[in-house]
């Protein structure tokens, strides 16, 4: 499961994890036993950022070759606020659309999710 977080007013929240690359990424995680994809999204967003989810929309599914799994992509509108980061998140920030596009690495699921979210919402 992977989530692109937006405040609905043009800002996107991205995180940089302590254990991964130095790049900014979308919130993502694995579904636990007896958990729906939506419950996983809510849990991961709360755990990694401390942000409150206001709305969630399924966008698409994506194959993630690194772990040989299928990721379900969501666009989540969250309440813009201060981050409360987990131990696995080094830093997080709010970024405008163009900056967020630049920060997400080319060829990643996060970049694809952003592209597809924009297409579904305003035809770009």
Please report, for each region that a protein language model flagged, where it lies by residue.
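Unchanged
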Residues: 31-116
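Charged phosphate-binding loop/patch that engages nucleotide di/tri-phosphates or the phosphate backbone
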Residues: 116, 120-124
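N-terminal strand-loop-strand
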Residues: 1-26
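Solvent-exposed, well-ordered amphipathic alpha-helical segments
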Residues: 7-11, 41-42, 119
């Amino acid at each position: 499961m992977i989530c692109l977080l937006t405040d609905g007013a043009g800002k996107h929240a991205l995180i940089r994890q302590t254990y991964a690359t130095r790049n900014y990424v979308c919130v993502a995680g694995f579904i636990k036993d007896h958990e729906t994809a939506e419950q996983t999204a809510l849990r991961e967003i709360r755990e990694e950022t401390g942000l409150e989810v206001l709305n969630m929309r399924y966008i698409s599914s994506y194959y993630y070759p690194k772990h040989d799994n299928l990721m379900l992509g969501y666009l989540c509108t969250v309440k813009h606020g201060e981050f409360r980061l987990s131990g696995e998140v080094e830093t997080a920030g709010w970024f405008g659309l163009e900056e967020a596009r630049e920060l997400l690495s080319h060829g990643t699921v996060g970049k694809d999710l952003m592209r597809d979210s924009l297409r579904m919402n305003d035809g770009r």
